UniProtKB/Swiss-Prot annotation:
The chain crosses the membrane at residues 20-40, 43-63, 96-116, 142-162, 167-187, 210-230, 235-255, 266-286. Keywords: Cell inner membrane, Cell membrane, Magnesium, Membrane, Transferase, Transmembrane, Transmembrane helix, Ubiquinone biosynthesis. The gene is ubiA. Its EC number is 2.5.1.39. GO terms for cellular component: plasma membrane. Its main location: membrane. HAMAP family: UbiA (MF_01635). This is 4-hydroxybenzoate octaprenyltransferase.
Length: 286
């Protein structure tokens, strides 16, 4: 394999070609930084968190593929991942995971001790998540914790503490993550049943759309509470209304439980998060 092909395989392993996960991680993190700073966050902190999100999302993909390498060959969507195809060896993947983990940890060393402590918990949660699919029917709920962990870290970086407001945003993102990752899990449900992978899509069964709707409503309520506690105004309120519109559209997409529309609904959450973040930022600026 040429160096160029190897680098492409590494990029695919880290999902550099599929930035949706990075974006879904980034929007709530940026919201946390803006809320904690009550406007423009410290530039150093902002850059550290943006780079950190990119690195940790890549690292999460690596450890996920390592854990699932023997199962991915039996799932249509994942059968050509680099660890399955042999383009990247297990040793190479674990080496890359270690190097990226060290890079992320070096970044947080520029911040206060509370952020460093929270980052250690975050790394442990990241490593644990892929194995949850073997022991619980609710791995998406664990993923919600992992993907929301940057929120208390962001508040800690800006304020040196994690106030109540942060936990409203944490719960909003947790509920939102469970909702959109269940949409994603519906895409793989038939394959997951064959190979024994557990998911909320399987757990919820024929009530999947309704329960996704409950989590969307809960996320909406917590986003509203986060805004109320932070004394946000009309523009943030418009962002909340847009979030409702996106949720309704996603419910229409997943109505038939077909793979392509469900995946489209999952991807649509990027726009929901982006618009809500922009509304929050503008609410402080105008």
């Amino acid at each position: 394999m040429s160096l160029q092909d190897k680098l492409r395989a590494y990029a695919r392993l880290m999902r550099i070609d599929r930035p949706i996960g990075t974006l879904l991680l980034l929007w709530p993190c940026l919201m946390a930084l803006v809320l904690a700073a009550q406007g423009l966050p410290d530039i150093k902190v902002l850059l550290i968190f943006i780079v950190g999100v990119v690195i940790m999302r890549a690292n999460g993909c690596i450890i996920n593929d390592f854990a699932d390498r023997k199962l991915d060959a039996h799932v249509e969507r994942t059968s050509m991942r680099p660890l399955v195809s042999g383009e990247v060896s297990v040793k190479e993947a674990l080496t890359l995971f270690t190097l990226l983990g060290l890079a992320a940890f070096c970044l947080v060393l520029w911040l206060n001790p509370l952020v460093v402590q929270l980052s250690v918990v975050g790394i442990i949660l990241t490593v644990m998540y892929p194995f949850m699919k073997r022991v619980t029917n609710m791995p998406q709920m664990f993923l919600g914790i992992v993907w929301s962990w940057s929120i208390p870290m962001a508040y800690a970086a800006q304020l040196g503490e994690v106030p109540v407001e942060a936990w409203w945003l944490f719960m909003a993102n947790w509920c939102w993550t469970v909702a959109y990752d269940t949409m994603y899990a519906i895409v793989d449900r038939d394959d997951d049943l064959k190979v024994g992978i557990k998911s909320t899509a399987i757990l919820f069964g024929r009530f999947d759309r309704q329960i996704i709707g409950v989590f969307q409503l809960a996320a909406l309520g917590c986003f509203v509470m986060a805004g109320l506690v932070a004394d946000r105004g009309v523009i943030y309120g418009l962002g909340i209304i847009s979030f409702i519109g996106f949720a309704v559209y996603q419910q229409r997409l997943i109505f038939g439980r077909e793979r392509a529309p469900c995946f489209k609904a999952f991807l649509n959450n990027n726009w929901a998060g982006m618009v809500l973040f922009i509304a929050l930022a503008l609410d402080y600026m105008i």
